[in-house]
Amino acid sequence: MAALTAENFAALQSLLKASSKDVVRQLCQESFSSSALGSKNLLDVTCSSLSVTQEEAEQLLQALHRLTRLAVFRDLSSAEAILALFPENFHQNLKNLLTKIILEHVSAWRAEAQVNQISLPRLVDLDWRVDIKTSSDSISRMAVPTCLLQMKIQEDPSLCGDRPSVSDVTVELSKETLDTMLDGLGRIRDQLSAVASK
């Protein structure tokens, strides 16, 4: 994620017009969300609370959004690391206030970002049963044991629209396929253990 530009830092100076620290805190909190950038309501609140034009409010909200996202993206959790984002000539008191606010909220923002990120489908539930499948070929009829694997898969809700985000998938596995799959899963488990122990 790219660092903030000089224009972003210039836009942040509009926060000096805030009547209290709580106004700055509220704007920081509300501007983190991606949906905040298109929010007419937040834009109007920013205009009225800071007495700025719509264009200035929009630039400020974009700058706050980038600043808070950058702190989360870079996993900044110390005052020194956050202060280093600002240029030397940035207003000292505002720099300290923004740093304090970011430190207060960075954990919650990180959790929110993880929840809202677009992700691969997730396995929610797994069940299985063993059945005997009657098979016939040209030589003889025979009973073949098979495993029916029933999985509940959760898609990313933001990508599903009106469709339900959880779907059922049933897979039939022969003994040979199951052996191959279990062998592969065993290797995956060993690799995950090796990575986790580093």
Curated annotation (Swiss-Prot):
The COMM domain covers which part of the protein?
A: 122-196
The family classification in the record reads: Belongs to the COMM domain-containing protein 9 family.
Q: What does this protein do?
A: Scaffold protein in the commander complex that is essential for endosomal recycling of transmembrane cargos; the commander complex is composed of the CCC subcomplex and the retriever subcomplex. May modulate activity of cullin-RING E3 ubiquitin ligase (CRL) complexes. May down-regulate activation of NF-kappa-B. Modulates Na(+) transport in epithelial cells by regulation of apical cell surface expression of amiloride-sensitive sodium channel (ENaC) subunits.
Gene Ontology cellular component annotations, sorted alphabetically? cytoplasmic vesicle; nucleus
Q: State the name under which the record lists this protein.
A: COMM domain-containing protein 9
- Keyword field: Acetylation, Cytoplasmic vesicle, Ion transport, Nucleus, Sodium, Sodium transport, Transcription, Transcription regulation, Transport, Ubl conjugation pathway
Instruction: Report if keyword Nucleus is assigned.
Output: yes
Q: Which Pfam families match?
A: COMM_domain, COMMD9_HN
The record's subunit annotation is: Component of the commander complex consisting of the CCC subcomplex and the retriever subcomplex. Component of the CCC (COMMD/CCDC22/CCDC93) subcomplex consisting of COMMD1, COMMD2, COMMD3, COMMD4, COMMD5, COMMD6, COMMD7, COMMD8, COMMD9, COMMD10, CCDC22 and CCDC93; within the complex forms a heterodimer with COMMD7. Interacts with RELB and NFKB1/p105. Interacts with CCDC22, CCDC93, SCNN1B, CUL1.
The chain residues annotated with the modification N-acetylalanine are 2
Where does the record place it? Answer: Nucleus; Cytoplasmic vesicle
The domain of life for this entry's organism is Eukaryota
Q: Which GO terms describe its biological process?
A: sodium ion transport
The record's listing under InterPro entries reads:
COMM, COMMD9, COMMD9_N
